[in-house]
Amino acid sequence: MKERLQQLQQEALEKIEQANDLKALNEVRVAYLGKKGPITEVLRGMGALSPEERPVIGALANEVRQAIQSALEAKQAKLEQEEVEKKLAAEAIDVTLPGRPVKRGNHHPLTRVIEEIEDLFIGMGYTIAEGPEVEKDYYNFEALNLPKGHPARDMQDSFYITEEILLRTHTSPVQARTMEKHKGRGPVKIICPGKVYRRDNDDATHSHQFTQIEGLVVDENIRMSDLKGTLREFARKMFGKDREIRFRPSFFPFTEPSVEVDVSCFHCGGHGCSVCKGTGWIEILGAGMVHPNVLEMAGFDSKKYTGFAFGMGPERIAMLKYGIDDIRHFYQNDIRFLQQFHRV
C-alpha cells in the first residue's frame, strides 16, 4: 500500500509538470483527486487494513493528497501568469508609432454669436438671467401688458400645454420674473438668452424653435438716450466701429414708445447693396421704454422708476454677420456647413 501511494504521487507530479494549459491541469486534478481517483480508492479501502496499518497508511495518504494539491495550485498559478503575460504581449501598444491626432472640434456658429453678445453686455455691466422654457401664461403674456383677449396675442401663435401653461414665445418672461424678485427696488440690468417656441412653418427665415436674447434696464432716470447709446455701442462692437443705428417707430405691448432698430449696412458702409436691399440699413432688433403697466405689475413705482428693454434673434445676427441665407442651416447638423466655422 505504501509503495502504491508513493507511485501515485510520483505519477501525479510528473503529469502536473507536463500540463501545458489549465484544461490539461484540471484533467490531472480529476484523475488523481476526483471521486473516482486512485487516492480516493485507497482511502475507501482502509477498512480492510489491520488496526496497526490503518493510521500509518491514512497519514501517508493525506500527505500524498496534500503534496498533489500543492503541486496543482503552484502549477495553476504559473499557467495563469503565463496567460496574462501572453495577453499583455498581444495587446501591447507600440508607443513609437505615430499617434492619430484628435479631430479638432469647434463651436456652433449660433453658440459663437450668443457668447459674443453675452460678453459684450457683460462688459457693459449686465448680468445673465435665466427662466423656464415651459412658462405660465401669466408671465408670458399678462405680466407683459398682454391680458387675456388682448388683440396683440394674435401676433404670436403659441404651443399651449394646458390652458395656463405654454412653451414661452419669447424670453421676456425672464424680465418679468426678475423684476418681481427685486420687489420694487432697482437697479435691474440683465440680458436673457434662451430658446423660444412659436407655431411658425419652417422656411428660410422662420423656425418653430429659435433663440432670443433680450435685455432690460430698470432704474431711476433711465431715458431713451440711454437705450440709444447702449445699442450704438453694441452695434459697433458687433458689426464694426463705424456702425450707426437708427430708430423707426413700432409697436410692442410691453414698451412705450417702441422702436425697430436698424444698423448701417456693414457690407456696403451704408451706400446700398443687395444685403441691405439698397437702403443702406439693416434691421437687427426691437426695443423701447418699459411700459408703466409692466413696471407696476412687477411691483415697481412707475413714477419713480423707468427702464428700457430690447430683444434680438441670434440667428438673424449670425445670418447677417456670416452671410447665411437660410435659418434651417443652423439646425440640420450638416458637417459641410458647420466645418466652415473652424476659424471664424
Curated annotation (Swiss-Prot):
Mind telling me which Gene3D superfamilies this protein's record contains?
Bira Bifunctional Protein, Domain 2
The gene for this chain is pheS
Q: What keywords would UniProt list here?
A: Aminoacyl-tRNA synthetase, ATP-binding, Cytoplasm, Ligase, Magnesium, Metal-binding, Nucleotide-binding, Protein biosynthesis
What is the organism of origin for this protein? Geobacillus sp. (strain WCH70)
Q: Top EC class per UniProt?
A: ligase
Record note on quaternary structure:
Tetramer of two alpha and two beta subunits.
**UniProt cofactor note:** Binds 2 magnesium ions per tetramer.
Q: Please give the SUPFAM superfamilies that the UniProt record associates with this protein.
A: Class II aaRS and biotin synthetases (SSF55681), tRNA-binding arm (SSF46589)
Alphabetically, the GO molecular function entries are: ATP binding; catalytic activity, acting on a protein; magnesium ion binding; phenylalanine-tRNA ligase activity; transferase activity; tRNA binding
A GO term (biological process) for this protein?
phenylalanyl-tRNA aminoacylation
Q: Which InterPro entries match?
A: aa-tRNA-synth_II (IPR006195), aa-tRNA-synth_II/BPL/LPL (IPR045864), Phe-tRNA-synth_IIc_asu (IPR004529), Phe-tRNA_ligase_II_N (IPR004188), Phe_tRNA_ligase_alpha1_bac (IPR022911), Phenylalanyl-tRNA_Synthase (IPR002319), tRNA-bd_arm (IPR010978)
Q: Would you tell me the protein name for this molecule?
A: Phenylalanine--tRNA ligase alpha subunit
- Catalytic activity reported: tRNA(Phe) + L-phenylalanine + ATP = L-phenylalanyl-tRNA(Phe) + AMP + diphosphate + H(+)
Q: Which GO terms describe its cellular component?
A: cytoplasm
Query: Which Pfam families has this protein been placed in?
Result: Phe_tRNA-synt_N, tRNA-synt_2d
Q: Where does Mg(2+) bind?
A: E256
* Cofactor(s) annotated in UniProt: Mg(2+)
